[in-house]
Swiss-Prot record:
Residues forming the catalytic site: 281
Glycosylation sites: 62, 212, 253, 316, 323, 355, 443, 524, 543, 565, 669, 713, 846
Gene name of the record: bglA
This protein's pathway: Glycan metabolism; cellulose degradation
Keyword Disulfide bond included in the entry's annotation: no
Enzyme Commission code(s) on record: 3.2.1.21
Record carries keyword ATP-binding: no
Name of the protein: Probable beta-glucosidase A
Species of provenance: Aspergillus flavus (strain ATCC 200026 / FGSC A1120 / IAM 13836 / NRRL 3357 / JCM 12722 / SRRC 167)
A GO cellular-component term linked to this record: extracellular region
Amino acid sequence: MKLGWIEVAALAAASVVSAKDDLAYSPPFYPSPWADGQGEWAEVYKRAVDIVSQMTLTEKVNLTTGTGWQLERCVGQTGSVPRLNIPSLCLQDSPLGIRFSDYNSAFPAGVNVAATWDKTLAYLRGQAMGEEFSDKGIDVQLGPAAGPLGAHPDGGRNWEGFSPDPALTGVLFAETIRGIQDAGVIATAKHYIMNEQEHFRQQPEAAGYGFNVSDSLSSNVDDKTMHELYLWPFADAVRAGVGAVMCSYNQINNSYGCENSETLNKLLKAELGFQGFVMSDWTAHHSGVGAALAGLDMSMPGDVTFDSGTSFWGANLTVGVLNGTIPQWRVDDMAVRIMAAYYKVGRDTKYTPPNFSSWTRDEYGFAHNHVSEGAYERVNEFVDVQRDHADLIRRIGAQSTVLLKNKGALPLSRKEKLVALLGEDAGSNSWGANGCDDRGCDNGTLAMAWGSGTANFPYLVTPEQAIQNEVLQGRGNVFAVTDSWALDKIAAAARQASVSLVFVNSDSGEGYLSVDGNEGDRNNITLWKNGDNVVKTAAENCNNTVVIIHSVGPVLIDEWYDHPNVTGILWAGLPGQESGNSIADVLYGRVNPGAKSPFTWGKTRESYGSPLVKDANNGNGAPQSDFTQGVFIDYRHFDKFNETPIYEFGYGLSYTTFELSDLHVQPLNASRYTPTSGMTEAAKNFGEIGDASEYVYPEGLERIHEFIYPWINSTDLKASSDDSNYGWEDSKYIPEGATDGSAQPLLPASGGAGGNPGLYEDLFRVSVKVKNTGNVAGDEVPQLYVSLGGPNEPKVVLRKFERIHLAPSQEAVWTTTLTRRDLANWDVSAQDWTVTPYPKTIYVGNSSRKLPLQASLPKAQ
């Protein structure tokens, strides 16, 4: 071996684990595919090659490695290349707005976007976020998320993504990406992949909770399930031209997500044709050589652990290229991928330096905050980037509110004599909307969950504020009891009320914070803060009780949903800063609810199957999460096991009624599917490397403490690496073929953005009439499901949908197409997609269990 960089022990341990017959194994795939500028990347790829060809080795390395935690203004920043006018890139959370900032908007969460089933709103939200990120001087938004997908209803970060259905998630994921990047900011598709729970996602985090485990959890999944479920939305992201992908903390089949050659090299880069760059989640980088050869392109935040001053890359990456352990083409490819994404969104024309600091709200501070070094300068310029986005946020909040039950209670008229507002979730956080770091508490109304996927509220309109305004405009009376434990007061208010509006919630978040004993993942899926008793007390004392649920996902409502005095139930999710106004718009009929549930409402937690792994189930080794449920999650699981939900996936009521009719199917003149064949071009080197003496620290450089630099300490590479394992034979740790830059065979399922172009060819055109049969304007979402026909397939899978607005008595024809991908299964033996000979049937309706229209499809290939 020529260079180990601390990863030798980890790699050795991994080889022992993977050699055990009873643990899942991730097969190697090498070499790491090099970008080729296919499709819409062609022009920016050429520009990237041109600029990278002019760079020195350390300039290339500077692009690949973060400068260290809290050492610049953003949560992650790369080095810069001043000689070529390439700035340090600013990377910043989150998927719903700018984290650690000010004068920014707090958008609805991804799960709310899923509930809208509205592609336009997904795009507009992405675009609005991109505008704010760009205006703050941020180059890369760390979002959106499709991992977790939602295998477990109690998974802590499900709300950051969209839905446990891959098709619904994939479409809205892609539209969000397009919106962000059209605003001139690189979007990051995360967390890739199988990051489905918080428990054990990071070994150090688990140790902090008292678990003695050697490594992070391994999500063990078969090839078919990976392709048909978890990889599906990431294919949509690649097809949408996403610039960055963030690899995850967990292991996949006992190989870490940021050094897993199967998921990074094979699936993402070779099969899906991803042309952008792969960054690590923060400290998810576990090796130097191993990660570089397995397909990682950018190390974030650059240091091995926060504020350690050490890095797997930086100077060590420079050493690795100089001594030949890592081929030049691999680091060149990293740099080209980063620069291609930079050019693709136009950052070269829109760049402004970050005008805020993540680490202080003070106007002035040190340039390098954590170590109090560098210039003492203006670090916060307090730039207001909100524009008119509050209107969009309010709109999404209202249009994502799912009406689950309505026995004539809604809409309200403002003529109600007395309105009772009941439950803590109606009111404000007594510590302020941003009173808990990263929203790590559940005080007052829940409009955002907790973790790094959050943003500071510029303000938060509570339900109490908004509804009181409504009542007073109607000259009514309003009583509010926001102590969820004061059941006697709640009962007294409910007895007097014309209508009782009960607000309840259920929270979750990221595993580094524990809230009320919930370590990221929910301990259960019941209501928090005595919610069930608040509802039952109100219903026992008021015959017109309407329940509004703010939650991160499904909750158990079996105790009271069918109570005769519960006349209405709405799910409002995590609606962001305009929460109260959004729910008031729906309650008072200014917005007719048209949202559909993006998940299933079961009667028990057990009805969902697939429990979280909350105990160390592999001794002191990496906990093992076996995804034996395969593709059967959420509604697919309920269908397979004949579980009757309370409210099914895709369900949602309206203040009007709709009728679907006249399903027509037209076969299209599609070509026969052809597996991709042939060879790639050989890898190319861009520029010359030169001698080690060119990459020693520049004379006179004033080093910043703990800052990660690309330069080496001396021309003695062994001494510069400071690695006791330096000098081992390559065969002991470098996988076969990992440094081979010759032409490589193309995979059958590859060939374009998102995979083989034949997958996206339209095979059938489908049309359905949709009519508003009621008296008010409203939105309907026709949903098209497919039965793939095989004995081990789900009963139905969602494939197409559209949100359509119709005036009273108006009729429209919804037309969509079915692609080969929509009808295909993954063939593990052929390593390609195939349309099986089993009969295919399509169903159209307005939920996964209300599908009145059906048609058989002719055989397709």
